[in-house]
Each structure stands twice: as structure tokens, then as C-alpha cells.
Regions:
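Short hydrophobic transmembrane-like helices used for membrane targeting/insertion
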Residues: 1-2, 19
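Bacterial N-terminal signal peptides
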Residues: 2-10
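N-terminal hydrophobic targeting/anchoring segments and the immediately downstream early-domain regions
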Residues: 13-190, 246-265
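Cysteine protease catalytic core and zymogen-processing segment of caspase-like enzymes
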Residues: 194-195
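Catalytic pocket-lining loop regions of alpha/beta-barrel enzymes
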Residues: 198-265
Length: 265
């Protein structure tokens, strides 16, 4: 939406200064842009409670994202997020988190394969996105926020890939088994000094499979190390510029320049 507003402003400024566009004119221009380009949201948190036969995204729920809103707003691609909050680094808690993550994967598959396959489809590649949109449907993609549910068994990364994950962050609000979180700035207590050895191995596996590394939430040191290691472009799915919003989970100029050099977004 920010990009759209910027484009509208840029376009309006290029017009004759003596020509004033009315609000209906601007709305029509915005709708025209939506009809010509693929619009996407790279981070849509979901609840499994909204993926049931009685309550789901075919309905006008109070959620920001649902099919009626997507269709009315000309919104094409929703990255639905498999998120499990950070817990203790123990086998028991890894198992609990893994089960919660699988339930969210299954919720997205339920929506796209059983509840509304005629209106929305899961995409695994950019070619899928174009094909689905050409067929007149909306697109779901899956990102993983916090690799904590992987546990210490890196074969779970391949399982998540098979279930549709195409990006994953290595930490959230709290240090994970893979990487330090930005939240370490609160007390300057760090667990790994960036990435753990397991985190370095996870990056190699994600590169092999084709899962983008998400820089949103890990610490600066974790992100800089990830950018140095990765062989593929990364994503900051829901971050802002720290120079504008000075909070620890935003990216400072050094990280943004490294992101540029990486070819990521």
C-alpha cells in the first residue's frame, strides 16, 4: 500500500500542476494500477480458528485479510505466516512448537484445497503465482516466522519446504537455537553472538531447498552473518528503516546496504 501511494503521488506530480484530480479520479487511477500489477502482502499472521468449515476466509471476517477483502481491494497474493512464539530450548518444547506449526500449515492447505479451491490456490513458485492470477484466483503463499519449531533436526526444514514454506526467519522475540534475536538489545544478553552453528547449517539447507532467509526479528549480528553466508537473495518481510523508527527490530543503514548488495528485498 505504501508503494502504491508513492506511485500515485509520483504520477500525480508528473501531471500539469494546473490539473486537479478529484478523489474519484485518484481512486480510479489506483484501481487501474491494481488491475495491471501483482499486489502482495509478505506477512499475514493467521489463526487456525479462522480456517474451519464454520469460520474461514471465504467470509467477511474482522481480519484484515480474507477473500472478500482481497477481491474488493484488488489484492492478489497473501503470504500466510506459520508463527510459533519462542519457548524454552528443550526437546519437549520443540515438539510442542512443531505440532503448532504443522497445524498452521494444514490450515492453509485446508483453505486452498478444500474450503475454497475455486477462489484461492497455494503457490510454490513465481510461475505458480502468474498462472493462478491468470486463472482469476487469489494466491496464498507460506512463510515461517521463527525457525524454533524446526527443533534441532534439520530434516524438518525439508518437511516445511514440502508443505509450502518459501521463506523462514531464524529467530523471533527471544533467542532461538539458530540465532540471536533483536530483543537481546534490551539487556545486552546474547546466546550465540549472532548465528549458532546449527543456524549456519540451516542457512545452507535453506539455500539448497529454495527457502528465502527472512531478516525480520533476528539481531543485527545474526543478519549480517546470514547475509555473508547465504548464496541466495534474502527478504526482510516486515521490517522498516531504523533511521526512521528507532526500534531494535528495524534494519539500520548497514543492514540495508548489505541487503541491497545481496539483491534481496
Amino acid at each position: 500500500m505504501i508503494a502504491l501511494l508513492f506511485l500515485l503521488a509520483s504520477t500525480a506530480c508528473s501531471q500539469d500542476d494546473n490539473v486537479t484530480e478529484t478523489e474519484p479520479d485518484l481512486v480510479a487511477r489506483a484501481r487501474g494500477i491494481h488491475e495491471r500489477v501483482i499486489t502482495l502482502d509478505t506477512h499475514n499472521d493467521i489463526s487456525t480458528a479462522n480456517f474451519t468449515a464454520d469460520r474461514n476466509y471465504t467470509m467477511a471476517l474482522s481480519t484484515q485479510v480474507n477473500l472478500p477483502n482481497m477481491e474488493a481491494g484488488g489484492f492478489d497474493v497473501s503470504w500466510m505466516v506459520v508463527f510459533v512464539g519462542q519457548g524454552d530450548l528443550t526437546p519437549e518444547r520443540y515438539g510442542d512448537a512443531h505440532r503448532q506449526a504443522l497445524a498452521k500449515f494444514e490450515a492453509v492447505h485446508l483453505l486452498t484445497e478444500q474450503i475454497a479451491p475455486d477462489r484461492i490456490e497455494l503457490a510454490l513458485t513465481s510461475d505458480d503465482v502468474r498462472r493462478i492470477i491468470a486463472a482469476g484466483k487469489k494466491v496464498a503463499m507460506i512463510g515461517v516466522e521463527n525457525a524454533y519449531p524446526i527443533g534441532t533436526d534439520l530434516s524438518n526444514i525439508e518437511l516445511f519446504h514440502e508443505m509450502g514454506a518459501r521463506y523462514m526467519s531464524l529467530a523471533h522475540n527471544g533467542h532461538s537455537q539458530f540465532a540471536d534475536s533483536n530483543t537481546g538489545e534490551r539487556d545486552e544478553v546474547w546466546l550465540h553472538g549472532g548465528l549458532s552453528e546449527l543456524g549456519r547449517k540451516a542457512i545452507a539447507e535453506m539455500n539448497r531447498l529454495g527457502i528465502m532467509i527472512d531478516l525480520s526479528h533476528p539481531s543485527k549480528e545474526s543478519n549480517m552473518q546470514a547475509l555473508a553466508l547465504t548464496r541466495a537473495p534474502v527478504i526482510a518481510s516486515h521490517s522498516a528503516a531504523r533511521a526512521v523508527g528507532d526500534v531494535s527490530r528495524n534494519l539500520d543503514d548497514e543492514q540495508l546496504m548489505a541487503l541491497k548488495e545481496n539483491g534481496g528485498v
